[in-house]
Regions:
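Long amphipathic alpha-helical segments
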Residues: 20-57
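Short, mixed-charge aromatic SLiMs
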Residues: 32-38, 73-77, 169-175
Length: 183
């Protein structure tokens, strides 16, 4: 993953729990330094180690830490780093999600060898099925946080009704069934 991701995780922990907790997370992770270049690609294991250490230090399940991080990514990092692109991507949550792949296409030109996840939206009566397809595994809780963060951004309450894993050869394909109501 790119340094931007690791820097965002660092930022979240520092803002919500303080510098001392970040130093504990860093020590517990075994990651030798916390100076990540945003545009540089780092081994995914570094990010997973930091998330695991955050779980250990903060006394929260890894899934809860990843969900919190997904919300932070949308509300803090992406908003600051890509605010104008986010604003242009949609006026409501579903419109935004439908444009997410195009948004990733624009960002892809900035990062070498970047293979973003894909999102597809289907209406299901009053609910929506949001397909998340990625080469990476283990990030479904992060996506839940992304969805909840987008809900906050667009003034919409997001309720995850179900998560269904679709069998794929490599990576992850998860269908999130969500209900959206005005907040």
């Amino acid at each position: 993953m790119y340094g931007l991701i690791n820097n965002s995780l660092k930022d979240m922990i520092q803002k919500q729990f303080g510098e001392e907790k970040w130093q504990e997370v860093l020590a517990a992770s075994g990651v030798p330094e916390d100076s990540f270049l945003s545009m540089r690609r780092y081994d995914d294991d570094i990010t997973y180690s930091l998330a695991g250490a955050a779980s250990e230090v903060l006394g929260a399940p890894v899934d809860a830490c990843l969900e919190m991080f997904g919300q932070h990514w949308v509300l803090e990092t992406a908003s600051k780093s890509y605010g104008m692109l986010l604003d242009a991507a949609g006026r409501d949550m579903i419109g935004f999600l439908r444009n997410m792949n195009g948004l990733h296409d624009r960002i892809t030109s900035t990062f070498l060898d970047y293979v973003p996840p894909e999102f597809h939206v289907e209406e299901d009566g009053a609910n929506f099925n949001i397909h998340y397809v990625s080469q990476r595994q283990g990030l479904n809780p992060f996506v839940v946080g992304l969805l909840k963060g987008l809900g906050t951004r667009f003034g919409t309450e997001v309720l995850i009704l179900d998560q269904t894993e679709v069998t794929v050869e490599k990576g992850t394909h998860t269908i999130f069934k969500v209900a959206l109501t005005p907040a």
